[in-house]
Every structure is written in structure tokens, then in C-alpha cells.
């Protein structure tokens, strides 16, 4: 078996046009895979310089392989099983700014640099007032980026054609707005002056993005077989699902510079990210939250098995297509395609997604992912959505604890205040009291849900049915 490097494998040399903060699994399986496809199919002709955002990371392993690695895509594509391996060659080099500060700052001096892409976790986009301009480097990611931008501004004497296009991928709603605000805070803190501020405002663009791809990461259990198949000793293989979506809130002139559409990729440039954020939360996360307790209390442990179950599968379909989809404001055909993609992802034969892992903090999840849909549905249709109501009753039942019919334990996990409340309510043995107490817990919902017409009665009816007939019979009654 060969080592993987540019001596043993082909690596194309391309102009360095992208600075990427982050060397983790997600960026390598998502952004770098996208850039690889743009190079191959849309003549993008760009390479990436990776910057490790924190002092300790994985760039030594990456550099040991000359930044070559494979992406293993697994899942269903239009019903067909796919399990592919692709060598990604887009990263030219990887730097640690803590030990290579000069080389890091020199990136700003390269005239062809055009893009900055980051994923430094949700905590990464934060202002740290202890950062100084002369730090080598500033400790926060926005601090490092401001150092780089200011050096570029000075190097090219405020040349308006040398601005950078910045795409943060951190999982924060309107991440671009947050990053921009933080850079303004550093401009203020470090007294970088109005001229630089004007250059940043006019020559650079920081755009909000929404990313979506499940990336399990390094394939520990399959790695021996993968290496055998590749005949390379690749220690940076990254596994991901086939589905990918990148929504970028930016004008068409930015899209023209980043021609992902020409490579047939699911990268959308849109005037507003908000409806896509809402679509993901509603049609991907929303069904997850209600299918999990329904599945588990029906004796099903894995999301894929829930989708394939003759009763629970129909329940999931009803919640998605007949209830939640009716509450969104995007074109119907687009929503249906997205929902079918979601079901294909839930059905992934390679990922054993345990429903219990989704059950963590179910009440706050229902509040953000399903409650808005329940209210909108009631408003638009004049009646309650049966599946979403049953989902709430299933969560309440799950929090009773105990054991399933097959002897498996039911172990809820949530904020202590919620756990204590449910324990106390179920101790009464009275489903009317349980319902009223849960719906009236304003510390969970921010309001009293007993005031929603018909909700308390419908939840109690479901709780009684689950106790008397079991979960599957209760689900059958609404299909």
C-alpha cells in the first residue's frame, strides 16, 4: 500500500484564490468537495490555503499527505445506493498561524486571493476585546480575519479591486451579519480608521450562508476496507451523505464569480436566506422531533426503520407533506423536492441514526421546530394538525419514563426543571393534570399553550389512547 502524497498521486497546481479557516471534516467534505467539482466541471481553476483557526488542530496530518485526501459519499441518490470515493486535490497547503504568523499574513499580499470561507464552530464568530492588532495572531477568528483584511488594505493601498468575498459556514442564522458586526467591533477597538472601514464596506462582501450535509467524519469501522480498495494509506478520509445544499445570501455578480451552478451543484444564490432556513428547520428538523418518540414508543430504534415501517412511515409522510409543508411560503414543487430528499436522507442505508439521540431536549426542540407550524396550520386551516399534536403527546409520554413492551428502558434527558415538572405531573396519574401542567409551563413555551383552542383536549385524548391502546394503534387512528 502506497503513502498518499503528490509523488504517488496526481495533484494539479492551481492559483491560490481561497483562504479557508478550518481544516475539519465538514469543510473538507462539503466546501472543498464543491470546489473540486467546480474545478473539474466549471473551469474554476482555484486552490485553497487552509488556515488552522486554533493552536492545535489537524494540519500536520493534512500536510503529511500533501493535503490530498478522499471523500467517501454514501447514501441513496434517486433511490439508487451510492458508495463512492473521490480524491480531493484542491488544498495547496495548510498553515498554523500560531507558528507561521508571517506566512499567514503574506496570504493578504497575494493579488489573486478572492474568497474567504470559514467554519470555526458556532462559538467561533465572537468578539474578544482582549485581542490586539499586534497579536501574532489575534486569538479569535474574526480578529485574525480583521488582521488579514487590514494588511491587504495597506499592501494594495486601498485598491477597490482587491477586496475579498467572505462566506462563513458556521451554524448560526445570518452568520454573515454576525461576522460583519464583529469585524466592525475590531475596526473600532483597534482604531483602524474610516478609510479602512469604507474599503471593507465597499470592496469586500460578507454574506450569510446556510449549509446542509450530514458528515459522519472519519470512517473508523470501514477504514481498513477503504484503504485496501484505494491502495493508499489515507488517514484523512472523510465520509459524508450524498445530499448537499449551500444557500448563499448574495447578489448575482457574486454568483458569477463562484459558478457552482455550472458544475451542477446544489448551491443557491438568493436574496434572502430566511425562507431556506425555515424550510430546513420545518421539514428536516421538525419531522425528526416528532417521529423519534412515536418510533421509540412503537419499538423502533433507528430513523431508517421508522421511515420503512408500514404505520410509522405513513405518520412521517403525513406530518411532512400534509401538515408542515402547508405552513411554508416557498413554491410547492420546491418544497416537495426538498421533502423527498429529506426522506431519502432519513432512509440512508449507511447511517444508523438512533432515535434516542434525537430525543435529547425534546421540549425546546418542539418549541422551535414544530410549534410554529402547529400554530400556522391552525390559523390557515381552522383545525389542529393531528400528526403534530400526536407528536407532542408522544414526547409527553416518553418523559414518563419506564420501560417499553420489549423491556427496553425509556430514559428522557432534558433540563432539570423540565424533568422535575414531568415527574411531578405523571405522579398524579391524571392525564388531564399532565396535559394542563405541560401546556401551561411558560418557562418551556414562552406562553400558555392551554389557550390554543382545542389543544389541551386533543393532547389528553392522545395521551389516554397511548396508555390504553399503545402507540401504533393511536397512530393508525389518525392515518
Protein language model regions, located:
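Substrate/ligand-engaging "lid" and interaction regions
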Residues: 1-479
Amino acid at each position: 500500500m502506497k503513502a498518499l502524497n503528490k509523488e504517488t498521486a496526481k495533484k494539479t497546481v492551481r492559483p491560490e484564490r481561497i483562504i479557508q479557516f478550518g481544516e475539519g471534516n465538514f469543510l473538507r467534505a462539503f466546501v472543498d468537495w464543491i470546489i473540486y467539482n467546480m474545478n473539474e466541471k466549471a473551469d474554476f481553476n482555484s486552490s485553497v490555503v487552509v488556515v488552522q483557526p486554533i493552536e492545535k488542530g489537524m494540519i500536520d496530518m493534512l500536510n503529511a499527505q500533501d493535503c490530498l485526501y478522499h471523500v467517501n459519499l454514501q447514501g441513496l441518490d434517486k433511490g439508487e445506493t451510492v458508495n463512492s470515493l473521490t480524491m480531493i486535490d484542491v488544498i495547496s497547503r495548510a498553515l498554523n498561524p500560531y507558528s507561521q504568523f508571517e506566512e499567514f499574513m503574506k496570504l493578504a499580499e497575494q493579488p489573486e486571493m478572492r474568497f474567504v470561507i470559514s467554519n470555526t464552530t458556532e462559538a467561533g464568530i465572537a468578539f474578544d476585546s482582549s485581542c490586539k492588532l499586534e497579536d501574532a495572531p489575534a486569538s479569535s477568528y474574526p480578529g485574525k480575519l480583521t488582521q488579514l483584511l487590514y494588511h491587504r488594505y495597506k499592501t494594495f493601498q486601498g485598491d477597490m479591486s482587491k477586496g475579498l468575498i467572505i462566506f462563513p459556514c458556521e451554524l448560526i442564522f445570518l452568520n454573515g451579519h454576525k461576522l460583519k458586526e464583529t469585524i466592525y467591533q475590531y475596526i473600532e477597538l483597534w482604531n483602524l480608521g474610516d478609510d479602512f472601514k469604507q474599503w471593507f464596506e465597499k470592496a469586500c462582501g460578507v454574506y450569510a450562508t446556510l449549509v446542509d450535509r450530514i458528515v459522519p467524519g472519519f470512517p473508523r469501522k470501514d477504514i481498513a476496507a477503504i484503504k485496501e480498495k484505494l491502495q493508499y494509506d489515507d488517514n484523512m478520509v472523510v465520509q459524508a451523505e450524498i445530499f448537499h445544499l449551500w444557500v448563499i445570501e448574495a447578489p448575482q455578480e457574486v454568483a458569477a464569480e463562484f459558478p457552482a451552478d455550472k458544475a451542477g451543484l446544489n448551491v443557491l444564490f438568493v436574496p434572502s436566506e430566511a425562507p431556506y432556513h425555515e424550510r430546513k428547520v420545518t421539514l428536516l428538523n421538525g419531522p425528526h422531533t416528532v417521529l423519534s418518540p412515536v418510533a421509540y414508543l412503537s419499538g423502533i430504534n433507528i430513523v431508517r426503520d421508522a421511515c420503512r415501517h408500514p404505520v410509522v412511515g405513513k405518520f412521517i409522510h403525513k406530518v411532512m407533506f400534509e401538515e408542515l409543508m402547508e405552513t411554508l411560503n416557498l413554491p410547492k414543487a420546491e418544497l416537495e423536492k426538498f421533502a423527498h430528499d429529506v426522506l431519502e436522507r432519513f432512509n440512508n442505508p449507511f447511517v444508523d441514526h438512533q432515535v434516542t439521540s434525537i430525543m435529547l431536549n425534546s421540549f425546546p426542540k418542539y418549541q422551535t421546530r414544530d410549534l410554529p407550524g402547529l400554530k400556522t396550520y391552525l390559523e390557515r386551516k381552522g383545525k389542529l394538525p393531528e400528526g403534530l399534536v400526536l407528536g407532542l403527546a408522544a414526547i409527553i409520554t416518553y418523559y414518563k419514563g419506564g420501560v417499553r413492551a420489549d423491556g427496553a428502558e425509556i430514559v428522557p434527558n432534558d433540563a432539570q426543571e423540565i424533568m422535575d415538572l414531568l415527574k411531578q405531573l405523571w405522579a398524579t396519574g391524571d392525564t388531564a393534570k399532565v396535559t394542563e401542567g405541560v401546556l401551561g409551563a411558560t418557562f418551556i413555551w414562552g406562553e400558555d399553550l392551554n389557550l390554543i383552542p382545542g389543544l389541551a383536549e386533543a393532547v389528553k385524548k392522545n395521551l389516554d389512547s397511548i396508555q390504553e391502546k399503545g402507540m401504533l394503534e393511536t397512530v393508525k387512528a389518525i392515518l
